[in-house]
């Protein structure tokens, strides 16, 4: 049981917050109850004096300026009478109490006896003072009750603080009293009292006419221009810092830029403007097109229209004709006639057209060399005939060579008989026979010796030559 009570006595954070919330709610509820109780008491006390309170409020808010001015003069006269009179304070206090007693006797004893009683119908009804902008007795009592309760709570907390922290309370009270003593030393107490009276008289007027709101509306543009706020002050400080940083960076940049310019000027030679203008000037009386002169500064002076030739540059004036330039470099191309020695089916480089080298027998080799040489001699004219005028030789070189080879092969095929493929295969077998006989003797049985008539039947072209 004791452990459970200990756990309950030590609540967690959530329970502590809930406890504080309940305590605050209970404190506000107690305060409201106190305000209501004080309001009821004040209404009972000030209820009979509602007309007088309404007149005092009207005078304080200057609803009727004439009466308000009279009230203000009377209060000032009374204040300065009590302040400057040579009478003693005890006499003044006794005289004030005597006046208060007389007024009370007149109000409660003498006036009710001489006053005419009201009808019963009027006594049964409750009447109240109504003004659109002035406070009624209940409203005034409510505000006075709130001030009274707030003051009592402050005094209660101050006494509690005195009991719990006597040292701090002593320091706080000494500081406040010292401030009041210094203030009373430099400003007289009479003047402070008069200032308090003026503030009490002018406060209802300021609240009634909303002078604070009007003053704020008028002073707001001025405050925005002057920028007296803390935010504006901090922003101005930040702007000043940024401007200082920019100025420092600009100075550093100018210093570095000047240093770099001085270094570059030390390395670069200084040229005279007249010399440069004379070198750049181009006239007919200067050097010829083939001359290249060197000036004193080490620069080349080239005449008009002249460009020095480098090692890899081309002389365009020497070879202006594209056909001539192509014909000059044509012998450098490799021959298109392939040597048939040692070829078999795997390394055949033909493009499917019959060839004279494969088709001619051993005896007819001399007769077939002449057409091949003719075709080889006619290759440049064939390529030049197919060359388009003014075209780019580099881009069309591959297409021109391939077209020339195909046309040459077709021209050779037109001179032969269409029955060329079978003798080609036989000739290949005949050419491979000597090399295969060197390997083994058994492979010799695969070949058959033919007569001259059979050879003539297989190759009519060779029979014609014989």
UniProtKB/Swiss-Prot annotation:
- Assigned keywords, A-Z: Autophagy, Endoplasmic reticulum, Membrane, Phosphoprotein, Transmembrane, Transmembrane helix
Q: Region Disordered: which residues? A: 244-263, 285-335, 412-444
Q: Which family does it belong to?
A: Belongs to the RETREG family.
Lumenal-side stretches of the chain, per the record, are: 102-168, 212-381
Q: Where in the cell is it found?
A: Endoplasmic reticulum membrane
Q: Where is the composition biased (Basic and acidic residues)?
A: 248-259, 316-331
Q: Write out the biased-composition intervals (Polar residues).
A: 294-310
User: Do you know which InterPro entries this protein is assigned to?
Assistant: RETR3_RHD (IPR055258), RETREG1/3 (IPR043384)
What is the recorded membrane topology of this protein? Multi-pass membrane protein
Q: Name the job this protein performs.
A: Endoplasmic reticulum (ER)-anchored autophagy regulator which exists in an inactive state under basal conditions but is activated following cellular stress. When activated, induces ER fragmentation and mediates ER delivery into lysosomes through sequestration into autophagosomes via interaction with ATG8 family proteins. Promotes ER membrane curvature and ER tubulation required for subsequent ER fragmentation and engulfment into autophagosomes. Required for collagen quality control in a LIR motif-dependent manner. Mediates NRF1-enhanced neurite outgrowth.
Question: What PANTHER family is this protein classified in?
Answer: RETICULON-LIKE PROTEIN, RETICULOPHAGY REGULATOR 3
Which species does the entry assign this protein to? Mus musculus
Which gene does this sequence derive from?
Retreg3
* Protein name in the entry: Reticulophagy regulator 3
Q: What is known of its domains?
A: The LIR motif interacts with ATG8 family proteins.
Q: Where are the transmembrane segments?
A: 81-101, 169-187, 193-211, 382-401
One GO CC term of this entry?
A: endoplasmic reticulum tubular network
Expression (tissue specificity): Widely expressed with highest levels in brain, lung, liver, muscle and spleen (protein level). Mainly expressed in the central nervous system and in parenchymatous organs including liver, lung and kidney.
Kindly list the positions at which Phosphoserine occurs in this protein: 26, 258, 260, 285, 288, 293, 303, 313, 320, 360
Any one GO MF term held by the record is:
endoplasmic reticulum-autophagosome adaptor activity
Q: Which residues lie on this side of the membrane: Cytoplasmic?
A: 1-80, 188-192, 402-466
């Amino acid at each position: 049981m004791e452990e459970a009570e200990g756990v309950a006595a030590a609540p967690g954070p959530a329970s502590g917050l809930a406890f504080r919330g309940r305590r605050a709610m209970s404190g506000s509820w107690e305060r409201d109850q106190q305000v209501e109780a004080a309001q009821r008491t004040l209404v009972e006390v000030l209820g009979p004096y509602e007309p007088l309170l309404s007149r005092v409020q009207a005078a304080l808010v200057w609803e009727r300026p004439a009466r308000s001015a009279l009230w203000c003069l009377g209060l000032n006269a009374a204040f300065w009478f009590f302040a400057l009179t040579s009478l003693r304070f005890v006499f003044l206090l006794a005289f004030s109490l005597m006046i208060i007693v007389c007024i009370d006797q007149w109000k409660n004893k003498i006036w009710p006896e001489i006053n005419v009683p009201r009808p019963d119908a009027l006594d049964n009804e409750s009447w109240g003072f109504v003004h659109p902008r002035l406070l009624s007795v209940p409203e005034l009592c409510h505000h006075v009750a709130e001030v009274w309760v707030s003051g009592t709570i402050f005094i209660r907390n101050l006494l509690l603080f005195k009991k719990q922290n006597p040292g701090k309370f002593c320091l706080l009270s000494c500081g406040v009293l010292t401030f009041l003593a210094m203030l009373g030393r430099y400003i007289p107490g009479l003047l402070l009292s008069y200032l308090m009276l003026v503030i009490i008289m002018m406060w209802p007027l300021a609240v009634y006419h909303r002078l604070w709101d009007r003053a704020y509306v008028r002073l707001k543009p001025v405050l925005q221009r002057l920028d007296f706020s803390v935010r504006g002050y901090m922003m101005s400080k930040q702007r000043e810092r940024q401007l200082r940083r920019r100025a420092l960076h600009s100075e550093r940049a100018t210093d570095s830029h000047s240093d770099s310019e001085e270094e570059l000027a030390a390395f670069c030679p200084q040229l005279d403007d007249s010399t440069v203008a004379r070198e750049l000037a181009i006239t007919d009386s200067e050097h010829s097109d083939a001359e290249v002169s060197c000036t004193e500064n080490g620069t080349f002076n080239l005449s008009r229209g002249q460009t020095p030739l480098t090692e890899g540059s081309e002389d365009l004036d020497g070879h202006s004709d594209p056909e001539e330039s192509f014909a000059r470099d044509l012998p450098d191309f490799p021959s298109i006639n392939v040597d048939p020695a040692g070829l078999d089916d795997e390394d055949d480089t033909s493009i499917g057209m019959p060839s004279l080298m494969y088709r001619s027998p051993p005896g007819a080799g001399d007769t077939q060399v002449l057409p091949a040489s003719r075709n080889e001699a006619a290759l440049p004219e064939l390529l030049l005939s197919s060359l388009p005028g003014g075209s780019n030789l580099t881009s069309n070189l591959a297409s021109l060579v391939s077209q020339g080879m195909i046309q040459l092969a077709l021209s050779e095929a037109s001179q032969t008989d269409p029955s060329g493929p079978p003798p080609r295969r036989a000739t290949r077998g005949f050419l491979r026979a000597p090399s295969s006989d060197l390997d083994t003797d058994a492979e010799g049985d695969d070949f058959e010796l033919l007569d001259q008539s059979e050879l003539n039947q297989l190759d009519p072209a060779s029979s014609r030559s014989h």
